[in-house]
């Protein structure tokens, strides 16, 4: 994951000081891209320990179309707690947009099911896209989508995906986002009888929060270790039938975790 450390250094060296919605302050750059060959290992940051339980359960939660944190709490995942209301609701965030995008005539579009059908029946299409950025519902969301738009691409029986992330918390959020979408590519590929290809991450406002500087320098002082390997133990009947226990990360030997405050 040298690319990730190089991005951190670039933000430190070239970033512009900016104010932000949370009032914390950031160093920010605009526009950056990283490419991860998923055949070379699972792109999970090794210079600090990442919480795999949260990454996997959050993705499964998105795929169910869920927008209440009850499922996450049942599985000891608290990463959305700060944004939920007293009933645990988040409004029409990622899961709702992925699985039930509302149409003007009162119907809903299941973007994930549509994408699966396209990959199986029209893999050369240039329209294999999922968007979470629903401008008509942004005001109802507890948090506007950061990872907002992703596209799939098939070549030589390999499935690749490019994500556009309009806002990126490099220290806390980005390791989660990379691993989550890499996992999604592997799952989609398995369901479509393809191999995993590349995951391409493209960032808009790419920033380090001012209260993450000490942690960033500590992480940059560490040497990256070998990437782990993802093993999917079975092939469920559908993309929506995966369980947490279906996934195993082999050979993950990270440096110790580094705590940092979340900007809310």
Curated annotation (Swiss-Prot):
Q: Which InterPro entries match?
A: Thymidate_synth/dCMP_Mease (IPR045097), Thymidate_synth/dCMP_Mease_dom (IPR023451), Thymidate_synth/dCMP_Mease_sf (IPR036926), Thymidylate_synthase (IPR000398), Thymidylate_synthase_AS (IPR020940)
Q: Where does dUMP bind?
A: 21, 126-127, 166-169, 177, 207-209
> Which sites bind (6R)-5,10-methylene-5,6,7,8-tetrahydrofolate?
51, 169, 263
Question: Does the record's keyword annotation contain Cell cycle?
Answer: no
The places in or outside the cell where this protein is found are: Cytoplasm
Q: Say which enzyme class the record assigns.
A: transferase
Classify the main location: cytoplasm
Catalytic residues at 146
What GO biological process term is on the record, naming one? dTTP biosynthetic process
> Which is an annotated GO molecular function term of this record?
thymidylate synthase activity
Q: In which pathway does it act?
A: Pyrimidine metabolism; dTTP biosynthesis
| One GO CC term on file | cytosol
Keywords attached to this Swiss-Prot or TrEMBL record, sorted alphabetically, are: Cytoplasm, Methyltransferase, Nucleotide biosynthesis, Transferase
Catalytic activity, EC = 2.1.1.45
Does the entry feature the keyword Transferase, yes or no? yes
Q: Supply the Pfam families for this chain.
A: Thymidylat_synt (PF00303)
Report the PROSITE patterns cross-referenced here: THYMIDYLATE_SYNTHASE
- Tell me which Gene3D superfamilies the record gives: Thymidylate synthase/dCMP hydroxymethylase domain (3.30.572.10)
Q: For this protein, what reaction is catalysed?
A: dUMP + (6R)-5,10-methylene-5,6,7,8-tetrahydrofolate = 7,8-dihydrofolate + dTMP
Q: What does this protein do?
A: Catalyzes the reductive methylation of 2'-deoxyuridine-5'-monophosphate (dUMP) to 2'-deoxythymidine-5'-monophosphate (dTMP) while utilizing 5,10-methylenetetrahydrofolate (mTHF) as the methyl donor and reductant in the reaction, yielding dihydrofolate (DHF) as a by-product. This enzymatic reaction provides an intracellular de novo source of dTMP, an essential precursor for DNA biosynthesis.
Subunit-level organization: Homodimer.
Similarity annotation: Belongs to the thymidylate synthase family. Bacterial-type ThyA subfamily.
> What is the official name of this protein in its record?
Thymidylate synthase
Upper taxonomic lineage:
Bacteria, Pseudomonadati, Pseudomonadota, Gammaproteobacteria, Enterobacterales
């Amino acid at each position: 994951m040298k690319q990730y450390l190089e991005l951190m250094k670039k933000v430190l060296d070239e970033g512009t000081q900016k104010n932000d919605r949370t009032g914390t302050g950031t160093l920010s750059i605009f526009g950056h891209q990283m490419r991860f060959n998923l055949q070379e290992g699972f792109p999970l940051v090794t210079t600090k320990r990442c919480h795999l339980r949260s990454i996997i359960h959050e993705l499964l939660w998105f795929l169910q179309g869920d927008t209440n944190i009850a499922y996450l709490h049942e599985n000891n995942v608290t990463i959305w707690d700060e944004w939920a209301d007293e009933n645990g609701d988040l409004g029409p965030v990622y899961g709702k947009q992925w699985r039930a995008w509302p149409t003007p005539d009162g119907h809903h579009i299941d973007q994930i099911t549509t994408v699966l059908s396209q990959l199986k029946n029209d893999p050369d299409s240039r329209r294999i896209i999922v968007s979470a950025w629903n401008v008509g519902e942004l005001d109802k969301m507890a948090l506007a989508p950061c990872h907002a738009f992703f596209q799939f691409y098939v070549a030589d029986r390999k499935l690749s995906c490019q994500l556009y992330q309009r806002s990126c918390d490099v220290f806390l959020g980005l390791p989660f986002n990379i691993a989550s979408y890499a996992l999604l590519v592997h799952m989609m590929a398995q369901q479509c009888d393809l191999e995993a290809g590349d995951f391409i991450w493209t960032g808009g406002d790419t920033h380090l929060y001012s209260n993450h500087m000490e942690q960033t320098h500590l992480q940059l002082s560490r040497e990256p270790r070998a990437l782990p390997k993802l093993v999917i133990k079975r092939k469920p009947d559908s993309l929506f039938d995966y369980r947490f226990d279906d996934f195993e990360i082999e050979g993950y030997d990270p440096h110790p975790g580094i705590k940092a405050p979340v900007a809310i």
